[in-house]
């Protein structure tokens, strides 16, 4: 992009297409490696720096394509520059419009690792899956696996545009939207109406190899017309919300660590079984 066009750049959110797979994957890998907590988790899930290899990137893209042929509730969006069409950011989410049986929700582990590496990785990923099961079980909701902005396009409203797109889906579907944030992205989500749940996930320093335990902020945003908290919604069994006749729904004008890791697990597992 020419320097003179930067100020007039407007992020546009569109559905990602098959030719976008590599570009979208490159965005979230770049974003992942640029964030401290995300980078830490990568070294656990993919020890030895394999995520940097071209073979891994190609296999991941192939696994993503295979997964797209069978996924019926997971959607990938791209955020592009309205002048050049460059992919600046991406979002990935499960939009669960129907209740799901236990078989569909089962956590299958980390099949490409063995021994202590697998045990360690599943100590990180397992609690994320368990918490989502605890909070929602088979209830209808939106789960954000990833919102990521390429480091070259930060501070241009890309992350905000993607979050606003998600909020719009939340309002239009009438479903709560749930995500695992990171300490660095949590303030933006709070500013945009997400609340931190009282439930906690704390990764132990012994597992992470860090000097201190790290807490994963769990966040939810309710539809704007729900007028109840998430705890109240959960206590009432996730009721349908009556939409006002003239609902004012916002039209849409980084990285989420836990969800993105779980998404990579699904893709690699799909590739291994293809």
Tell where the protein language model's regions lie, with residue ranges:
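Conserved active-site alpha-helix within GNAT-family acetyltransferase domains
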Residues: 160, 172-174, 183-203
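Hydrophobic beta-strand residues of extracellular immunoglobulin-like
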Residues: 75-78, 217
């Amino acid at each position: 992009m020419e320097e003179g066009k930067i100020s007039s750049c407007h992020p546009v959110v569109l559905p990602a297409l098959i030719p976008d797979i590599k570009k979208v994957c490159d965005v979230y890998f770049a974003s992942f490696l640029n964030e401290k907590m995300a980078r830490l988790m990568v070294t656990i899930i993919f020890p030895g720096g394999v995520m940097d290899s071209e073979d891994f990137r190609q296999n991941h893209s192939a696994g993503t394509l295979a997964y797209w042929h069978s996924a019926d509730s997971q959607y990938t969006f791209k955020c592009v520059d309205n002048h050049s069409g460059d992919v600046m950011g991406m979002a990935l989410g499960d939009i669960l419009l129907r209740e799901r049986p236990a078989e569909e929700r089962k956590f299958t582990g980390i099949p490409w690792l063995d021994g202590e590496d697998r045990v360690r990785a599943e100590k990180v990923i397992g609690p994320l899956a368990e918490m989502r099961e605890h909070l929602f079980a088979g209830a209808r909701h939106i789960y954000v696996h990833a919102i990521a902005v390429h480091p070259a396009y930060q501070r241009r409203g890309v992350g905000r545009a993607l979050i606003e797109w998600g909020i719009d889906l939340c309002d239009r579907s009438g479903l709560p939207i749930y995500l695992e944030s990171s300490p660095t992205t949590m303030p933006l989500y709070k500013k945009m109406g997400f609340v931190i749940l009282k439930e906690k996930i704390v990764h132990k320093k012994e597992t992470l190899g860090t000097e201190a335990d790290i807490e994963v902020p769990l966040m939810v945003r309710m539809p704007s017309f729900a007028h109840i908290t998430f705890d109240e919604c959960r206590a009432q069994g996730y009721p349908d919300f009556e939409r006002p006749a003239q609902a004012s729904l916002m039209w849409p004008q980084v990285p989420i660590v836990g969800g993105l890791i779980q998404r990579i697990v699904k893709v690699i597992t799909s590739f291994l079984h293809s």
